[in-house]
């Protein structure tokens, strides 16, 4: 990542299974559906800093590609159909990111206008790419291992362990506080991707 790189230790920290992993949650205990659907809320969990927010913000955003942006760019809704309930899922992910990196909202956002990218710190772009990186790793590398993982390494719904921000960051704004991993492990550096040349059509 950037100029520092990552190794197995970045996530594993000397353990066979990284400490910060997640599985898709089964929100409703069997037989409780006659009392209504809590939608994964009001069950405090460490991943959302023990708040009442939905406690599995990872499945919709780091496994699926649900819309994270909730507020519109205009004072009135003007076609924005996102609800408060949907917004709470976004807040759940943002709370997780905040605690995982040891930062607050203004590390990535200009709180004057959350809907605008103008005037935001460069970390917002990094976070945008980080969300997509986590999703790609979950979908393209971990999910295909479903049949390989033994049953004792799977979640309650039979899914494999997946990663989120805390898997690598573990409370630091840069994993391992930016320790240079490439310097001691140059053999892990992949070959640069070939440059794409646009073909000129007559």
Question: What does each of the following model-derived ranges do?
Answer:
Residues 1-202:
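Sequence context surrounding c-type heme c attachment/ligation sites in exported
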């Amino acid at each position: 990542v950037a100029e520092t790189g990552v190794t197995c230790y970045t996530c594993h920290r000397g353990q066979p299974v990284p400490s910060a992993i997640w599985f898709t949650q089964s929100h409703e205990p069997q037989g409780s559906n006659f009392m209504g659907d809590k939608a994964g809320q009001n069950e405090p969990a460490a991943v959302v800093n023990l708040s009442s927010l939905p406690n599995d913000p990872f499945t919709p955003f780091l496994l699926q590609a649900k819309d994270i942006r909730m507020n519109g760019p205009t004072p009135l809704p003007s076609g924005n159909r996102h609800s408060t309930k949907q917004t709470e899922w976004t807040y759940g992910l943002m709370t997780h990111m905040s605690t995982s990196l040891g930062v607050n909202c203004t590390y990535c956002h200009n709180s004057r206008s959350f809907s605008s990218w103008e005037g935001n710190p460069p970390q917002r772009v990094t976070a945008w790419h980080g969300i997509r990186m986590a999703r790609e790793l979950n979908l393209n590398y971990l999910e295909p291992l479903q049949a390989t993982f033994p049953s004792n390494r799977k979640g309650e719904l039979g899914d494999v362990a997946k990663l989120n921000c805390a898997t690598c960051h573990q409370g630091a704004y840069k994993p391992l506080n930016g320790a240079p991993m490439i310097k001691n492990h140059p053999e892990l550096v992949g070959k640069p991707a070939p440059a794409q040349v646009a073909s000129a059509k007559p």
